């Protein structure tokens, strides 16, 4: 058995070639072989979001704080809040991030296949994100606002 203390691994900033806005990644674990699972606590500041991406063996997100969005390619935008669990199947193109006025934190758990856990794709554009923030999904009480989230 191994115990990893909270904060025992350094936080890293989410790289600009994978995220838009300010994102902090706190690595939690990477299971030793033959296990393939890894996990991190990821915090998105308001308006921050991942780029579109896929996972070869899928991904599970567990929202722990704030309010945010998740969307599969061609699918509806879904609002996510603390306690929500999102299961992304293998190969599903998706993105996730914070709402315009709220940070969002989730635990991200995924498995490695052939040394890969994620394949990063194109950014979610400001126009795509603003359409989400303008309540394109029609869901009530979503924590959305007219705040502009243009990134530098």
Give residue spans per PLM region.
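Short, well-ordered turn and helix-capping elements at secondary-structure junctions
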Residues: 7, 27-32, 46-48, 74, ...
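A short, N-terminal "cap"/entry segment at the start of jelly-roll beta-barrel domains
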Residues: 1-37, 117-152
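Ligand-binding loop in jelly-roll beta-barrel domains
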Residues: 33, 69, 76-77, 81-82, ...
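Short acidic/glycine-enriched loop/turn segments that link adjacent beta-strands
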Residues: 22, 36, 57, 102-103
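Short, solvent-exposed aromatic-acidic interface loops
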Residues: 43, 111-113, 125-128
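A short beta-strand-loop-beta hairpin characteristic of the jelly-roll/cupin
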Residues: 49, 54-82, 92
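Conserved short histidine dyad/triad with adjacent acidic residue
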Residues: 24-27, 38-55, 90
């Amino acid at each position: 058995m191994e115990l990893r203390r909270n904060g025992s691994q350094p936080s890293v900033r989410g790289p600009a070639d994978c995220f838009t806005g300010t994102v902090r990644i706190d690595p939690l674990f990477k299971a030793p072989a033959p296990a393939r699972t890894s996990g991190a606590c990821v915090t998105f500041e308001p308006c921050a979001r991942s780029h579109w991406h896929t996972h070869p063996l899928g991904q599970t997100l567990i929202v722990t704080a704030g309010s945010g969005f998740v969307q599969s390619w061609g699918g509806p935008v879904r609002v996510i809040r603390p306690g929500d669990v999102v299961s992304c199947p293998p190969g599903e193109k998706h993105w996730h991030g914070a709402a315009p006025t709220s940070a969002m934190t989730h635990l991200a758990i995924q498995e490695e296949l052939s040394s890969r856990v994620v394949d990063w794709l194109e950014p979610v554009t400001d126009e795509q994100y603003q359409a989400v923030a303008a309540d394109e999904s029609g869901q009530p009480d979503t924590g959305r606002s007219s705040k502009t989230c243009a990134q530098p």
